[in-house]
Amino acid sequence: MARIAGVNIPTNKRVIIALQYIHGIGPKFAQEITEKVGIPTGRRVHELSDAEVLQIREAIDQGYQVEGDLRREVAMNVKRLMDLGCYRGLRHRRSLPVRGQRTHTNARTRKGPAKAIAGKKK
């Protein structure tokens, strides 16, 4: 298994697919990285030489924010919104949808399981 950006990527998959196991690298960035390094699209990870793996590592380190750094930045952005006390920050703090979605019904994923409320007896 090749270890890139602190992640063991699967050896039997194509390089473009395997790179997407790294948090912060999707299909577009994986394609860009392989083109930059000059690896054919059909090549599998176990067929890569150590030099090619090193080139991929360097390309990711230079141009992309991945894994822990990316997670930390996203968490800091959310914390900043909450500290500002803006509308988006309040929605994050209350664990409600942030982007204007309906909450009267739906939003169960964000709000958690339904809480039972005693109703009128018939």
Curated annotation (Swiss-Prot):
GO terms for biological process: translation. One of its GO terms (cellular component) is small ribosomal subunit. InterPro entries: Rbsml_uS13_C (IPR027437), Ribosomal_uS13 (IPR001892), Ribosomal_uS13-like_H2TH (IPR010979), Ribosomal_uS13_bac-type (IPR019980), Ribosomal_uS13_CS (IPR018269). PROSITE patterns: RIBOSOMAL_S13_1 (PS00646), RIBOSOMAL_S13_2 (PS50159). Pfam families: Ribosomal_S13. One of its GO terms (molecular function) is tRNA binding. It comes from the Bacteria. Keywords: Ribonucleoprotein, Ribosomal protein, RNA-binding, rRNA-binding, tRNA-binding. Residues 97-122 are annotated as: Disordered. Located at the top of the head of the 30S subunit, it contacts several helices of the 16S rRNA. In the 70S ribosome it contacts the 23S rRNA (bridge B1a) and protein L5 of the 50S subunit (bridge B1b), connecting the 2 subunits; these bridges are implicated in subunit movement. Contacts the tRNAs in the A and P-sites. PANTHER family: 30S RIBOSOMAL PROTEIN S13/40S RIBOSOMAL PROTEIN S18, SMALL RIBOSOMAL SUBUNIT PROTEIN US13M. Part of the 30S ribosomal subunit. Forms a loose heterodimer with protein S19. Forms two bridges to the 50S subunit in the 70S ribosome. Belongs to the universal ribosomal protein uS13 family. This is Small ribosomal subunit protein uS13. It comes from Bartonella tribocorum (strain CIP 105476 / IBS 506).
